[in-house]
Amino acid sequence: YYNGLKFHRVIPDFMIQGGCPNGVGNGSPGYRFEDECSPKARHGKAGMLSMANAGPGTNGSQFFITHTATDWLDGKHTVFGEVVSDADQAVVDAIRQGDVIQSAVVEGEVSALLASQAERISQWNAILNA
């Protein structure tokens, strides 16, 4: 889904945002899902990967990665990953508006997560494939 999409919003010292199928920030995959904010997953440092949204329950495909701590986003945007090394954060910090995602790859053991969300994933794929 993400391969070939642009980083359509880049704000220095704040974040980079991508995942819009239209490339300008107004698109979605055709479905929305609820927030899954947790006090254990916070925006307390650079490199937090979170869902971009337009308010509660409006998550779709857009995401952002922070350049710095952004505590004011806690409870408003679901954190679902993080940049794990300084070298990777340097890549995030070098991304400019309009840069294209060449390939998105999920690393690590995700089979239990995918199994627990199988019904939702099936529904989302039906929308994407329609």
Task: Identify the meaning behind each predicted range.
Residues 1-130:
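Cyclophilin-like peptidyl-prolyl cis-trans isomerases
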